[in-house]
A protein has these predicted regions:
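Cap/lid segment of the alpha/beta-hydrolase catalytic domain
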Residues: 23-44, 52-61, 70-75, 266, ...
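Core domains of intracellular innate-immunity/apoptotic signalosomes
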Residues: 66-90, 114
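Structural WD40 beta-propeller signal
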Residues: 44-46, 89-91, 139, 186, ...
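Hydrophobic beta-strand positions that form the internal "hydrophobic ladder"
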Residues: 47-51, 95, 145, 190-192, ...
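A flexible loop/linker signature enriched in serine peptidases of the S9 family
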Residues: 1-7, 30-35, 54-63, 78-82, ...
């Protein structure tokens, strides 16, 4: 709502014309808190109870509460130290939830019955291998509850009948090294996305009654050029989330005819994903879409008629016109000849003459894809003459599993050299001025910032590193820290000399030299469970010891937040404003937005 920092969650009964009922006002819960974030938000099957969880310091250890929606009363049941997963059984009194271990890994699934002591909750599954994270979820069909555990290299999924929560969980397939799978339910069968004999994953099916591997069979032909990310089952259709040619894609499969088709999107670069879509018996799938130019949009897609209906496009203040802006996709050549996609955004009238300031971002880790989405904050930059760009470097998932694997472990340096190649390409092609390049990355993207700054300090004018993972060797040598053991399969285990030596060769903290480095803005969160605050602090301290006086070097520590920074939307905007002001100031860019007419020189 206008003027409020946090969301207000509402519902209407039966029709959008019905009266609106507020089920949870985050602003009320956040009063008196410096930090506030909702984790789970789940209404019981009979619509009478609301389970929600809160984090009030940024540590990502949530407290679960149950609210009676008819009266607003909070039940006495209260569960601490939970993560992000939860599922109601269909009896409306039993639910399953996770717990964190000392390293803040969700490792245990428990069952609670309302009105009973939390201390007596039985454990339904405990994952003892520290490489695996646990997740609990309920099928869209509302028939089954799943407990899934997954590492970087293996998966294992169990299920129980949601109508009979006292039952035992059934294992679908035991874990195997280098075998990943995820599951959705439809009637008497499971649809499974797996990489078994399919590097970029495929869709298989198996009977619920006998789900073991002997009964797995391909449902759709495997296409090695397409990365399958997820499958969502509806009554008469499968919705398959994919990546094609480096871009997100959605494919629809008619379960009766077997016919498939893609949903088409026209822009050269964009972001698209499925909305929550809780209803199983429907022919409509709701999609979230945006691009550099198109604001966040909610689209209903009719899977039978193949028609799109725009339900809502987020309003943009300040007289925003899509026609004033342009985006494109270009490719830079890496050191080994591989072509790296770059998404570009600028104002129409932009002159490709090598004088523009550039803000280039990147991530390149965990197989996560960084797609072009809408940000009114980014509009403020390009209105000042900036080119904004995303480098889709190896280590991310944009171009499939191999793209990811070629940027991890003993190939991690590809991520860094790819980013350098993208920067040099944009300068050579005159998208940017040689001395007006700012780069931005957070967390594992902050590692990227530190590594490329060491490799090519001459290439960048300014660096913005948000909660950066920069003390790689030290952090990965301490198994008591959150994420260390689970991420051996991402970075390697430094107890092995080959991984120790390789990490030592790129870890930003360990490779600082007495050099003329770029201007640097670093942020940290005191309660950050993923990148401890001391990592960026000691990185900055070491640089200050060797600092040249004609360079700006700033560290801002948020004393009341964690990995994601401030929680309120206005406070988040202030953080972005600080980062962008740093880029504008250090690149000597215009402090005032320019009109398209000014950019065109008329």
């Amino acid at each position: 709502e206008t003027g409020k920092q946090y969301a207000v969650h509402c519902r209407k009964k039966g029709s959008l014309d019905a009266n609106e009922e507020v089920i949870l006002d985050e602003n009320e819960l956040a009063k008196g808190q410096k930090y506030f974030r909702i984790g789970i938000l789940s209404v019981s099957p009979n619509h009478k109870l609301l389970a929600y969880s809160t984090d009030t310091n940024g540590s990502e250890a949530y407290v679960i509460r149950i609210k009676t929606l008819e009266t607003g009363e909070l039940l006495p049941d209260e569960i601490s130290n939970s993560s992000y997963s939860f599922a109601w059984a269909n009896d409306n009194k039993t639910f399953f939830y996770d717990q964190l271990d000392d390293a803040q890994r969700p490792y245990k699934a428990l069952k609670h019955i309302l009105g009973t002591s939390v201390n007596q909750d039985p454990t339904v599954y405990e994952e003892k291998d520290a490489r695996f994270f646990l997740e609990i979820y309920k099928s869209r069909s509302e028939k089954l509850i799943f407990v899934s555990v997954e590492s970087e290299r293996a998966s294992e999924v169990r299920f129980v009948d949601a109508d009979h929560p006292k039952g035992e969980f059934t294992l679908i397939r035991p874990r195997e090294n280098d075998l990943l799978y995820s599951v959705d339910h439809h009637g008497d069968r499971f649809f499974i996305v797996t990489n078994e004999n399919a590097k970029n994953f495929k869709v298989v099916e198996t009977p619920v009654a006998s789900p073991d591997k002997e009964h797995w069979k391909d449902y759709l032909p495997y296409d090695p050029e397409v990365k399958v990310d997820a499958v969502d089952a509806f009554e008469n259709h499968l919705v398959i989330s994919e990546r094609r040619n480096g871009l997100p894609a959605i494919r629809i499969c008619d379960l009766k005819s077997g016919e498939t088709h893609e949903i088409n999107f026209d822009e050269p670069t964009y972001e698209v994903s499925l909305d929550r879509n809780p209803v199983f018996k429907t022919g409509i799938v709701r999609i979230d879409y945006s691009s550099f130019i198109t604001p966040n949009s909610v689209i209903d897609y009719d899977m039978v008629s193949r028609r799109k209906e725009l339900k809502k496009e987020a309003p943009v203040l300040g007289g925003y016109k899509k026609s004033d802006y342009a985006s494109e996709r270009v490719f830079a050549k890496a050191d080994d000849g591989v072509e790296i996609p770059i998404s570009l955004f600028y104002k129409k009238g932009f002159r490709k003459d090598g004088t523009a300031p550039l803000l280039l971002t990147g991530y390149g880790a965990y197989g996560i894809s960084t797609d072009a989405n809408f940000s009114s904050s980014t509009i403020s930059l390009v209105d000042r003459g900036f080119v904004f760009a995303i480098a889709h470097i190896r280590g991310g998932g944009e171009l499939g599993r191999t793209w990811y694997e070629d940027g991890k472990l003993l190939k991690k340096k590809n991520t860094f050299t790819d980013f350098v190649s993208c920067t040099q390409y944009l300068i050579d092609q005159k998208y940017a001025a040689p001395k007006r390049v700012a780069i931005l990355g957070g967390s594992a993207g902050g590692l990227l910032m530190g590594a490329v700054m060491n490799m090519r300090p001459d290439l960048f004018t300014s660096v913005i590193a948000a909660v950066p993972f920069v003390d790689v060797l030290n952090t990965m040598s301490d198994p008591s820290l959150p994420l260390t053991v689970t991420e051996y399969e991402e970075w390697g285990n430094p107890q092995d000399p080959k991984y120790f030596d390789y990490m030592a060769s790129y870890s930003p903290y360990d490779n600082i030299e007495e050099n003329q480095y770029p201007n640097l803005l670093v942020t940290a969160g005191l309660n950050d469970p993923r990148v401890s605050y001391w990592e960026p602090a000691k990185w900055v301290a070491k640089q200050r010891k060797l600092k040249h006086q004609n360079r700006i070097l700033l560290l801002k520590t948020n004393m009341g937040a964690g990995h994601g920074g401030d929680s309120g939307r206005f406070d988040q905007l202030k953080e972005v404003a600080m980062e962008y002001a740093f880029a504008i100031d250090t690149l000597h860019a215009s402090s005032r937005p320019e009109s398209a007419k000014q950019l065109l020189g008329r």
